[in-house]
Amino acid sequence: MAANPALPPQNIEAEECILGGILLDPEAMGRIIDLLVVDAFYVKAHRLIYEAMLSLHGQSQPTDLMSVSSWLQDHHHFEAIGGMVKLTQLLDRTISAVNIDRFAALIMDKYLRRQLIAAGHDIVDLGYETSKELETIFDESEQKIFRLTQSRPQAGLVPLSETLVNTFIELDKLHEKLSSPGVETQFYDLDAMTGGLQRADLIILAGRPSMGKTAFGLGIAANIAKNQNLPVAIFSLEMSKEQLALRLVASESLIDSNRLRTGHFSQAEFEPLTAAMGTLSSLPIYIDDTASISVTQMRSQVRRLQSEQKGPLGMVLIDYLQLMEGGSDNRVQELSKITRSLKGLAREINAPVIALSQLSRAVESRTNKRPMMSDLRESGCISGDSLISLASTGKRVSIKDLLDEKDFEIWAINEQTMKLESAKVSRVFCTGKKLVYILKTRLGRTIKATANHRFLTIDGWKRLDELSLKEHIALPRKLESSSLQLMSDEELGLLGHLIGDGCTLPRHAIQYTSNKIELAEKVVELAKAVFGDQINPRISQERQWYQVYIPASYRLTHNKKNPITKWLENLDVFGLRSYEKFVPNQVFEQPQRAIAIFLRHLWSTDGCVKLIVEKSSRPVAYYATSSEKLAKDVQSLLLKLGINARLSKISQNGKGRDNYHVTITGQADLQIFVDQIGAVDKDKQASVEEIKTHIAQHQANTNRDVIPKQIWKTYVLPQIQIKGITTRDLQMRLGNAYCGTALYKHNLSRERAAKIATITQSPEIEKLSQSDIYWDSIVSITETGVEEVFDLTVPGPHNFVANDIIVHNSIEQDADLIMMIYRDEYYNPDTPDPGVAELLIVKHRNGPTGVVKLLFKPEFTQFLNLQRSNDY
């Protein structure tokens, strides 16, 4: 295939006309926002300018010259686009925005052609991948083209009358082949309980599949359009316009929807069918069936519809919530952002917005299938591999292995005292498969959780999708250890050496390697102390290395193994390569002193303890390994000693496996290390002594173990107002030079917080200064995919420690009205109430909750009142 030297399809002049037109006439933005995407612009500067315009339009701000230039400056793009010269150039080259629609279509045409070229290149490359099955190649190629066709601009809202014409043609072809304070729904009991749908309310209508969510939503929409002649906008992300129209026709004509769909209806039914078409055609119902639509696009279309109708809207229906796009690169915050935006939309247009929502499978797992509020909340969950520390033994168990267990104790924070306490778990359960995100802190602690799982901040519990980077969350400062030592000091020492520098692979001699003779001799000593005459260790010098071979003193057979092999097998750590190694659970079950012994010997292998002498000396201790799991285990063991170490990944730039460093800095943590862990060999012992001397001669400078600066706004400032203490007086008592409000921009050390607690006589600040919490900042939140997730129930504190992070297990729901549909006959065909549907009002911000019973006719996909109208 000959290379095409020409530039990719583009039209720079049209791009300039579009941008200049918007700068001249900001109202023109509404005409192209649904047609034109950012990436359609060929020139990068044009993409940045259009992105600014989209952002401003989404915030209901003008897209004039000053607003756009200000946005670009605030986001550090002003110089990149060419500054004010570029913007004024766009204005100078544009006369008006009259033809902006045609230019937008032209730009999208060029963009899609570029995308087609790129897809073509990808498909050509796939053709050369002979290692893949041909069917797989075809499938991937089709997907690329399909995704491209889906990126075309959608038609937007289409009048129902136009859709019904096509629907009637299709039906004919098939046949030939064979007053209230709110908006009244005409469902009388519902209107009586709610006073009608309140304008500016966000309403969630939830249920499991096949309960009739769409049918009920369409019924409300049709009733509002028919009885009050108010425009209704329907955004269907799941079903096409034609499918919705067919449902409305079936409900209005009372003809079986299945027979309509297949064309099997009689000649006599043409009259009610035609009448239904006429009735529905006159209704002000507008449908957009774009498969994936953002809130920004939706808002733009609703605004336009309201402007065209020159009056209020009856309602907006969205089917359904989980299919909406949030327009954010970080999916963590999207769902929360969508619901907030929908509530904002309801307030802006002063009309009820009904969002249909799919309930989780948790409903199906219960004997009573009636949905509950918690099913919609989808209480926060964590991944099955999350490790829970058992308070009774110190053992760590993955939450999935605790499934159905109860009455065991874990660690939880008592929010009254801010101290860690043991708390009993009443239930462990699986909540199905959900999208999870991995949260990582500055110390390298990580946990995978759903977007609605909550974490403790200085301002209280926040959902993961409400957290921001650099925000501090609560970690335990220390986890207590067991008081019963089940492994000898010699076993712990030998295990530390073998995990660090031992080779314990099958069909290989048990071997330990060191460049220090004293460590080789120490391993021999420890091995003899543990296994006695069952082994016959020897040291062999090979170049600069000392190899310690530890064979059995007897002949090995199929059923007779080296005693060290059996020992390591019992600990589940035999046969591991360096990057697979980890610390066995038995070590976590030891007392603090025993854990320190294990770490002392492990540190003698790939650990480092030294005083770095530069312009200013600084002590450091770190352990390096190619096993991420081992690094995490070491970090968790250090936590049992009260050391909050940092875990970091050290890339080898393709020259080998990445390394993981567990690093200890800070005077308080290093003091614990040198006092309790220390060193085995003489070189490290000398370094330990140097660090001890350095610590004794230098004052600690806390910049990591701090209380977040939000403490000023949340606790300190309200307290000094209560006590009548001025800012100047507070700073004087703290021994500071007066600096006004600049002081409030800084985090607080625990010591300074304690001083403030004394000055202000605040028990809350005092508890924070003496808490069992280490506040660590968030460095990343990343989507990882869908996986099985679990949760705990902890009566009392309602939180627990998982992966050495304090987490909660409940969330909030912010809708004004929440309704859930339940049909008993779906689960129980022999129900005494066939055809009866229950509408459960589980949350009502401005009125009562309760149950409304309706009649459901599945053949017509229709809901009806069970009782006659009553005045309310």
Swiss-Prot record:
Belongs to the helicase family. DnaB subfamily. Its EC number is 5.6.2.3, 3.1.-.-. Homohexamer. It catalyses: Couples ATP hydrolysis with the unwinding of duplex DNA at the replication fork by translocating in the 5'-3' direction. This creates two antiparallel DNA single strands (ssDNA). The leading ssDNA polymer is the template for DNA polymerase III holoenzyme which synthesizes a continuous strand; ATP + H2O = ADP + phosphate + H(+). Keywords: ATP-binding, Autocatalytic cleavage, DNA replication, DNA-binding, Helicase, Hydrolase, Isomerase, Nucleotide-binding, Primosome, Protein splicing, Repeat. The main replicative DNA helicase, it participates in initiation and elongation during chromosome replication. Travels ahead of the DNA replisome, separating dsDNA into templates for DNA synthesis. A processive ATP-dependent 5'-3' DNA helicase it has DNA-dependent ATPase activity. The intein is an endonuclease. InterPro entries: DNA_heli_DnaB-like_N_sf, DNA_helicase_DnaB, DNA_helicase_DnaB-like_C, DNA_helicase_DnaB-like_N, DNA_helicase_N/primase_C, Hint_dom_C, Hint_dom_N, Hint_dom_sf. This protein undergoes a protein self splicing that involves a post-translational excision of the intervening region (intein) followed by peptide ligation. The intein-coding region can be inserted into another gene and undergo protein splicing. The keyword NAD does not apply. Residues 494-643 form the DOD-type homing endonuclease domain. One of its GO terms (molecular function) is DNA helicase activity. Residues 176-443, 606-870 form the SF4 helicase domain. SMART domains: HintC, HintN. This is Replicative DNA helicase DnaB. GO terms for cellular component: cytosol; primosome complex. NCBIfam families: DnaB, intein_Cterm, intein_Nterm, PRK07773.1. ATP binds at G207, R208, P209, S210, M211, G212, K213, T214. One of its GO terms (biological process) is DNA replication. It holds the Pfam family LAGLIDADG_3. It comes from Synechocystis sp. (strain ATCC 27184 / PCC 6803 / Kazusa).
